[in-house]
Design a protein with these regions (language model features):
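Cleavable N-terminal export/targeting peptides
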Residues: 1-32
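Outer-membrane beta-barrel proteins
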Residues: 28-219
Length: 219
């Protein structure tokens, strides 16, 4: 079983390396770091915190390739998150490989680094397609087989997203509508020379009959 898991990890790392090599070109590389402060962590129609969530990120981009870390931390007893991702754009198509990791689920000092990034069910592949004003997304977890399909568009200044999912996304595990989201963003002027990007989202999950109103600022 360990050999099988190691083989899976090697294949996943090989995919990341392939994306990196295919993106090597004479372009300006750029590092970036920042954070979003959200009133609540809501992802794909489900809430993952009961209160404010700090979501830092660190990334490196070169041309159409980007690799980075993204985290979510809430002081409310919920599970923290630290993800590794790599993405590459080819015209209207975007490819992303993400490893979702929840450090609180692991006992300190008992997990080797290679096992940390080989958590079962944590690797997800995503394909995005821009078709004019419509953005389509398909994502699947390689080990768990969970699927997520979404379509997004802009209605003036408001972004609309409709998502469907199966497995853990829905109460019965069958494919169903689990996300209807309306989002809006604006800059809040602090001084003449400084402003804070702010966003708000109204999210409804028809499957769970849950609604969220989320506000956030970006640093």
């Amino acid at each position: 079983m360990k050999n099988l898991n190691l083989s899976k990890l090697i294949l996943k790392i090989a995919l990341v390396v392939t994306i990196v090599l295919s993106s090597m070109q004479e372009v300006k590389a750029q590092f970036d770091v920042g954070a979003d402060i959200m009133s609540r962590y809501v992802w794909r129609g489900a809430g993952y915190s009961n209160g404010p969530s700090i979501q830092p990120y660190m990334s490196y981009a070169s041309g159409d390739f980007e690799i980075g870390f993204w985290g979510a931390y809430a002081n409310d007893g919920q599970v923290d998150e630290l993800d590794l991702y790599a993405s590459y754009g080819i015209g209207p198509v975007g490819l992303t490989l993400t490893n979702y990791v929840f450090p609180d689920n692991m006992t300190p000092g008992t997990v080797a680094p290679v096992e940390y990034w080989a958590s079962e069910g944590g690797w997800e592949g995503t394909i995005g397609l821009e078709l004019g004003p419509i953005a389509l997304t398909y994502a699947t977890f390689f080990d768990a087989g969970s699927n997520y399909i979404a379509a997004g568009t802009s209605l003036g200044d408001v972004d609309l997203t409709i998502g469907l999912g199966d497995d853990f996304y829905t109460t019965d595990g069958d494919m169903g509508l689990m996300e209807i989201s309306l989002g809006y963003g604006k800059d809040i002027m602090i001084t003449e020379d400084f402003s804070l990007p702010a966003s708000g989202s109204l999210i409804y999950n028809p499957d769970a009959d849950q609604m969220y109103l989320v506000f956030g600022i970006s640093l």
